[in-house]
């Protein structure tokens, strides 16, 4: 394997102003070392694609939510004459890195997608996803949207994001992450009990009648599970993994008509299990460009014989963003050097930097015949 060259002494480099040194904060040891190594490998791929030998990566082990390790790693990177650092990978570590106001941090976190002090978050933000989803729902001529998300530590953050977006024709529905409780909550949302009763009452109207029309109507009703529509025509489910599968299963169980209700969720990084292991025929979600994502994964696998963690493509793009700023300005002095007026195209899609906010132009995807199709 070919690894990034580690430079431990900046004095070894001549013509310092012609060299771009980028730090990397990654968990290179401990339970998340696999992620850390994946980040290092992704930057190696980015370096090879850029093809400029004047760029050097200085990775350091920052642990995972380990303040002491993070602090030591930053100080070590800073001592090498580095101005811009890729990381930290979690939003919880932002408070510490803010103290290093003479450094610039490009984080793959998607929690706060904007310029915050000396940090730029370039993750696939909830704002970007919701903007794309609501526009998609509008184009499908749906106007009664339920935005669903679990009651957990992120609930308040999601509510704040939704409030800032001021989405119209929508209502919020928070649910339990416990599958046993969840089904009952969705029964209430979908008015399931009343729709079941309505069906039984309707069937009784025809049970004692023997005319052909009544017999046919009864046969039709026998094929149904409920009678009547739900009071929404679209859903946005802000959840992942097995929790998302449970929500989808509960919506199917409560007989939500998939021909009348549009099912959408947020970015799932093309997780095949989400789309192939649920009973929803058409599930839509916004994401980065699938072809670029697949090409990145295939190139990574060809080189390292394992597939990368999804977050690494964000770091891959972060290096490209740093390189662009460096080439455009001839140097990087402050976070303002990244306040581009024009849109920037990367692997994950197209970035725009408006009012110091970072937004991505995402595509809508669905599954069709076991394939991801751009809608």
Regions found by a protein language model. Give the residues of each.
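Extracytosolic ligand-binding ectodomains
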Residues: 2-6, 12-375
């Amino acid at each position: 394997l070919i690894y990034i060259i580690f430079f431990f002494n900046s004095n070894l480099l001549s013509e310092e102003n012609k060299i771009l040194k980028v730090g990397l904060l990654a968990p290179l040891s401990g339970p998340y070392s696999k992620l850390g190594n994946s980040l290092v490998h992704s930057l190696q791929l980015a370096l090879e694609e850029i093809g400029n030998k004047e760029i050097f990566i200085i990775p350091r082990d920052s642990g995972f939510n380990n303040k002491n390790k993070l602090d030591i790693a930053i100080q070590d990177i800073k001592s090498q004459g580095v101005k811009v650092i890729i990381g930290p990978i979690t939003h919880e570590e932002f408070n510490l890195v803010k103290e290093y106001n003479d450094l610039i941090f490009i984080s793959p976190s998607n929690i706060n997608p904007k310029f915050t002090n000396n940090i730029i978050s370039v993750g696939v933000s909830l704002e970007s996803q919701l903007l794309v989803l609501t526009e998609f729902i509008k184009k499908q001529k749906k106007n009664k949207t339920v935005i669903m998300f679990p009651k957990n530590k992120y609930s308040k953050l999601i509510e704040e994001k939704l409030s800032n977006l001021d989405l119209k024709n929508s209502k919020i529905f928070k649910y339990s992450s416990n599958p046993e409780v969840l089904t009952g909550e969705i029964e209430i949302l979908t008015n399931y009990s009343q729709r079941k009763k309505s069906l039984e009452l309707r069937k009784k109207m025809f049970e004692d009648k023997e005319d052909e029309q009544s017999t046919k109507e009864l046969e039709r009703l026998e094929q149904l599970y409920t009678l009547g529509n739900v009071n929404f025509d679209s859903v946005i489910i802000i959840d992942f993994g097995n929790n998302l599968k449970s929500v989808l299963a509960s919506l199917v169980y409560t007989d939500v008509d998939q021909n009348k209700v549009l099912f959408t969720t947020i970015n799932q990084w093309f997780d095949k299990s989400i789309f192939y292991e649920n009973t929803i025929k058409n599930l839509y979600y916004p994401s980065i460009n699938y072809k670029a994502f697949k090409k990145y994964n295939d190139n990574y696998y060809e080189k390292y014989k394992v597939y990368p963690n999804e977050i690494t493509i964000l770091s891959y793009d972060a290096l490209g963003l740093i390189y662009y700023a460096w080439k455009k300005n001839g140097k990087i002095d402050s976070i303002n050097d990244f306040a581009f007026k024009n849109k920037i195209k990367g692997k994950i899609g197209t970035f725009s930097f408006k009012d110091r906010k970072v937004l991505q132009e995402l595509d809508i995807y669905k599954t069709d015949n076991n394939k991801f199709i751009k809608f």
